[in-house]
């Protein structure tokens, strides 16, 4: 998840949000486990879970969930082989749609701070009862069960079995820093691409207008 700052900003305004997360994927699919899409109070959409029919169906599910509806765990089978199949990527994805409330603001502030410092942190979402997911954020590795730590070490998000409960584990993944020497048009395009895939971008240029964050 790289939406912690966006989520925190909206929660600070007292908003209720809908968050869609790919929690499991097998085979070929447009996005990986951990990809997310956020729907805000004014129905703005931040992030993507891959577009197409899947995203359209999930977006439709987000609207009632944001207003107070029951969380949903949606299953999409994209292994259709016929030419008229709507979804033929070849894979299968499970997507959790949950309501995010202002009471959860401390978790998201903490996660955003950890990400900015490249510090350890991991999201856990107990989805044993998909209608009532339990989301929490953890920063103390020594307090986590061995199966969770094993998943964290894989540097990827996934669902695991934890003492008979189904738990989604999403470690903070720090992509590193891209330093651009010069702020011209090539660096601008490179920086935008690097930011899009999760890197922190630093531009070094003695011309203030070229090193401006507004670019």
Predicted region positions:
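Segments forming oxygen-rich coordination pockets for charged ligands
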Residues: 1-215
């Amino acid at each position: 998840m790289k939406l912690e700052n966006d989520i925190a900003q909206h929660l600070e305004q007292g908003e209720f949000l809908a968050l869609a997360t790919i929690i499991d994927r097998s085979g070929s699919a447009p996005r990986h486990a951990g990809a997310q899409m956020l729907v805000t109070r004014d129905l703005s959409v931040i992030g993507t879970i891959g577009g197409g029919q899947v995203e359209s169906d999930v977006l439709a599910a987000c609207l009632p969930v944001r207003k107070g509806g029951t969380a949903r765990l949606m299953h999409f089978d994209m292994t259709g082989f016929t030419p008229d199949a709507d979804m033929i990527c070849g894979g299968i994805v499970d997507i959790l749609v949950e309501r995010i409330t202002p009471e959860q603001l401390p978790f998201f502030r903490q996660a955003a701070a950890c990400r900015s410092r490249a510090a350890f942190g991991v999201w856990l979402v107990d989805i044993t009862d998909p209608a009532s997911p339990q989301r929490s954020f953890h920063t103390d590795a020594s307090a986590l069960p061995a199966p969770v730590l094993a998943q964290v070490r894989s540097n990827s998000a996934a669902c695991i079995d934890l003492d008979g409960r189904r738990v989604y584990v999403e470690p903070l993944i720090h992509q590193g820093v891209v330093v651009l020497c010069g702020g011209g048009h090539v660096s601008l395009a490179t920086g935008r691409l690097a930011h899009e895939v999760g890197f922190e971008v630093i531009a070094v240029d003695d011309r203030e207008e070229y090193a401006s964050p507004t670019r």
